UniProtKB/Swiss-Prot annotation:
InterPro entries: Ribosomal_bL33, Ribosomal_bL33_CS, Ribosomal_bL33_sf, Ribosomal_zn-bd
Coiled-coil residue windows: none
NCBIfam families xrefs: PRK00595.1, rpmG_bact
Keyword tags: Ribonucleoprotein, Ribosomal protein
Name listed for the protein in its UniProt record: Large ribosomal subunit protein bL33
Family: Belongs to the bacterial ribosomal protein bL33 family.
Gene3D superfamilies registered for this protein in UniProt: Ribosomal protein L33 (2.20.28.120)
Highest taxon in the source lineage: Bacteria
A biological process term (GO) from this entry: translation
GO cellular component, one term: cytosolic large ribosomal subunit
UniProt GO MF annotations: structural constituent of ribosome
């Protein structure tokens, strides 16, 4: 069976709350690091989330 090219990543809050989302991305089409504005329930507002390696 072929191994998928999608890699699991962690989107971590830049607010310093420790909250994170997990998702996957295609490494071939998007080799750069992702950054999204998402809701942080700890900070109770939308903050930038940056991609970090999932351990």
């Amino acid at each position: 069976m072929a191994k998928g090219i999608r890699e699991k990543i962690k989107l971590e809050s830049t607010a310093g709350t420790g909250h994170f989302y997990t998702t996957s991305k295609n490494k071939r089409t998007t080799p750069e690091k992702l950054e999204f504005n998402k809701y942080d329930p700890v900070a109770r507002k939308h903050v930038p989330y940056k991609e970090v390696k999932l351990k």
